[in-house]
């Protein structure tokens, strides 16, 4: 009897699985999109979900070698496409309707809720318009002062390991500096992460950005319904960390609202205006103030609305920048001719005083450093893949992508295509100087995405990268010490072996 029941249940399960996949399977077959062998129910999950974040990049690369620039993949009922084909990049990133992020972005939702990174539709359009004011050039000048101040703390903290012999994982130092920058820029508060890394908000944020990406590559934790059962302690830790972060952000918002209320009551409050010469002054918390005085359809943003956007800015402004800066320092350390050319540019543009503050205008004159940053993000894009979810059937060239398919544009491999970047594995910043004359396919290089959903904070990110990199190089010579990179894929590109360099104080500073 039990055997009959089990057999019947299995037949029903297989029939259900076949039925829900049938149309997508037929579409893939019609379009001849290749991929690994899929078994009933599990799909291809057993091939990938045991690899871990440190091995998935290599696995994806092997599949590109085997199947070409695009391959399909199944995990349970999820149909996915991985591609490095620029025709897919152009079609998807240029679309004004294909704006829903891939399924993996759902791991961000418990923390970011419906913030700009994961929202869609009218809400996304309205919030995006508000955010453009936060990156006005006058506001950016104020941010540069914040970046410069916290970068000085970073180089001071590096002194104790700058002996020319010790391999230093730069991500640990850069990440804390970036947290100090983004917390002050986003919320107008100083958490002093570089000297107090155990501050509760900082610990909670670091915990969340470790737990959630790790779930993508563990079958027992991948699904929200299974995660609390498979890892109850980790699940409770995640909920606790998110509560700590939300409580902190709520407290900052509440205190700022009260400050504004008192200013209005005594007649000293003056709303921000982009025509106001003082918008970049040190007295302004530009991002939070702009959100507090913003409205959509004549309705002011609620505390919950503001929190999810501040949290989004915190997430995107910490990990992505930290990855970019750390990988740049790693590459510079291993290319002494590049390092020397940057240093000469810094001396020429910023002057010999390593402690002198920098301005936005000076940073914009660092043309070669700009090329170094671009080349770093070509080889080591902080966001190694961009996801979109096709709710409806999609035509790309002669291919038909079935509805309910997540499509992942793998920047990590597209940026290494020899058709667009000769000698693609070589670190050669000059290729971006040459591109000013030669040009290249717009979608061959998209570290900040492209189209309507491109990164709205990219100018902020590049300025911060320039400030942090230039500050380190003005004080220290970088040396090629420590383990080589072992690229690790999660939301942000990391290295399982650390991002290591050695540091030696510049002669004038010894």
UniProtKB/Swiss-Prot annotation:
One of its GO terms (molecular function) is iron ion binding. It is a peripheral membrane protein. GO terms for cellular component: endoplasmic reticulum membrane. Heme binds at residue 455. InterPro entries: Cyt_P450, Cyt_P450_CS, Cyt_P450_E_grp-I, Cyt_P450_sf, Cytochrome_P450_Monoox. It comes from the Eukaryota. Keywords: Endoplasmic reticulum, Heme, Iron, Membrane, Metal-binding, Microsome, Monooxygenase, Oxidoreductase. Disulfide bonds: none annotated. PANTHER family: CYTOCHROME P450 4AE1-RELATED (PTHR24291:SF187), CYTOCHROME P450 FAMILY 4 (PTHR24291). This is Probable cytochrome P450 4d20. The lineage of its organism: Eukaryota, Metazoa, Ecdysozoa, Arthropoda, Hexapoda. The gene is Cyp4d20.
